[in-house]
C-alpha cells in the first residue's frame, strides 16, 4: 500500500487517526483460505472450509492470505511498515477455492449461505468475495449466485466482489462482479 500512496502522493494524514482502521468491524473473506501469519494474530474468529471440509485454518494457494493481508494485515511482521486497509478488523475466513484458485458454484454458494447463517454470530459487516464465474455460466446458476450475494447485501452487509479476473476485454467481467 505504501507504493500506491507514494505514486498518488497521498499518505492519508487527514484520516489516519479516524475510526476507519477496522476496529469493531468483522470482515468475511471468501477465497482460498488463510495461512496463519503474525499480521492476523488474535483476529481470526471463524473458519469454514467448503472445499475439503477441514477444520484447521489453512491456505493451499496463497491467494486468500494475500487478499486478507491487503484487507486486514496489521503490519506486525514488518514493524508496521506494510499493513492492510483495516488492520484492526476481526476476520472470518471461508475457503471456497482450491489450491489452483478454482471452485464450483456449489462451493461458493455454500460459503455465502454459511456467512448469511452466521452473520449475527460473528457480527459480519463486510464480505470480500474474490471470485468470478467463468463467462457462459448457465443462467439459473448465475441467478442463484446473484441472489445469494444480494441476500447478504439486503441483510446490511457490504459486499465487495472482484471484477476483471479474466482480463480487460469485453465480456470478461463475470458474475457476481458484473
What spans do the regions from the language model cover?
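Subtilisin-like serine protease catalytic core
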Residues: 15-28, 32-46, 54-106, 122-125, ...
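Substrate-binding/access-modulating region of protease and related hydrolase catalytic domains
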Residues: 96-178
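Short, well-ordered amphipathic alpha-helical segments that serve as non-catalytic structural scaffolds
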Residues: 7, 74, 110-112
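Autoinhibitory propeptides
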Residues: 1-18
Amino acid at each position: 500500500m505504501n507504493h500506491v500512496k507514494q505514486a498518488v502522493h497521498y499518505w492519508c494524514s487527514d484520516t489516519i487517526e479516524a475510526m476507519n482502521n477496522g476496529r469493531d468491524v468483522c470482515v468475511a473473506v471468501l477465497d482460498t483460505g488463510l495461512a496463519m501469519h503474525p499480521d492476523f494474530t488474535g483476529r481470526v474468529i471463524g473458519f469454514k472450509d467448503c472445499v475439503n471440509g477441514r477444520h484447521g485454518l489453512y491456505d493451499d494457494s496463497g491467494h486468500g492470505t494475500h487478499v486478507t493481508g491487503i484487507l486486514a494485515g496489521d503490519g506486525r511482521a514488518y514493524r508496521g511498515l506494510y499493513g492492510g486497509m483495516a488492520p484492526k478488523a476481526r476476520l472470518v475466513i471461508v475457503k471456497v477455492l482450491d489450491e489452483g484458485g478454482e471452485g464450483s458454484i456449489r462451493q461458493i454458494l455454500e460459503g455465502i449461505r454459511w456467512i448469511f447463517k452466521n452473520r449475527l454470530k460473528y457480527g459480519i459487516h463486510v464480505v470480500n468475495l474474490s471470485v468470478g464465474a467463468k463467462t457462459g455460466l448457465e443462467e439459473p446458476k448465475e441467478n442463484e449466485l446473484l441472489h445469494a450475494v444480494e441476500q447478504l447485501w439486503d441483510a446490511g452487509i457490504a459486499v465487495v466482489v472482484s471484477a476483471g479476473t479474466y482480463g480487460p476485454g469485453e465480456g470478461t467481467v463475470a458474475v457476481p462482479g458484473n
